[in-house]
């Protein structure tokens, strides 16, 4: 008998032999509730009368086009020609001219010339022309210099954050400060990298701004435990809170980072989802401080900012386009960021073209400008209205309080859960807010994310719900089901 006739169990036969950091990592936005929602949706297809609703409302994730947001015409016209350039052979025909304005044709030809083809690899750092346009956009937005060499195109903001955290987290005692409540991507990535998460609280009493005294306390306590805080994540506008960080808090964080040698990672993907005031980037605030205090070592503050085509008025989540830009990063370290990008080969080229259209949209006088502005304004106003409608709905819900968000796509209401519900949940070894969310899903078909998935303190109960769904019917379902749950357990 040959020694190759038998078999030996492989790595997947013993779960304990696999990377335990993967088992530890948790991404609540697409966790157990989302899986249950999919199962219920499948049940509804087979038996439409099995639940007191006809479809699931996926209010657990910021996925605008899934919830009915229309794509921007200019964006899809350019992508159409780039995906199927043979159409350009018909540019002189009437039907073509009715479908594709001249600036769409010009942009498509320019992008095809730069990329070669959407099916071809690009440079790992991204298409040079697109990076130049990103630098121009940042320069115009903030009023301070930005170079194309500081721009790295990515397959979304999540990829951008992962690149930076992969490079910075080198050992288990390397700490990353993350806001609480936090977007769970960061906690999951820290777990995967075997790093240490250091939570700092946002103040619900102060519109979810940074509680700076607690921020410093979190750093000090981590340091006493031997954790070397190397990176701090700031999310502006906030996810899940929808709040904007005040300029005063921005300055405090930048000064603290300078004093303690901490790299800042600014997640600014919701910069076009602001419903009050205007967006102020961390990059701009750093530039203002450097201009105001030229001899105060501001060139020692390393800042990475990320943006994406998934949010804002584009809502192109599935296309996977984004970028990171770096400030005050030494060239040898930038080389290592590029090395990590090279390992991934390149971001999706279609996503890179979307980034170009995000930062370099039609301008006044261009044939596509009027329609582009009309669509962008309509989407922005629709989101503002949907935000207001859902916020007003929370006022009719028992044991709920909610701050009106200033940005992003979410409400983060506080729910004072009845003691009977908490006891029932704990008896079933389920987090109380998750138990509530399951009850809500089964009664209303609305899928939300329990606050425990965002790192909320023990005994503090919230949910995150998007306001991307159109109309008010789902709000009535939400209010009715919530109040039924409260009545049942009070």
Swiss-Prot record:
GO terms for molecular function: L-alanine:2-oxoglutarate aminotransferase activity; pyridoxal phosphate binding; transaminase activity. Pathway: Amino-acid degradation; L-alanine degradation via transaminase pathway; pyruvate from L-alanine: step 1/1. Its EC number is 2.6.1.2. GO terms for biological process: biosynthetic process; L-alanine catabolic process; L-glutamate biosynthetic process. Keywords: Aminotransferase, Cytoplasm, Mitochondrion, Pyridoxal phosphate, Transferase. Homodimer. Alanine aminotransferase involved in both alanine biosynthesis and utilization. Belongs to the class-I pyridoxal-phosphate-dependent aminotransferase family. Alanine aminotransferase subfamily. PANTHER family: ALANINE AMINOTRANSFERASE, ALANINE TRANSAMINASE. This is Putative alanine aminotransferase. It comes from Schizosaccharomyces pombe (strain 972 / ATCC 24843) (Fission yeast). The gene is alt1.
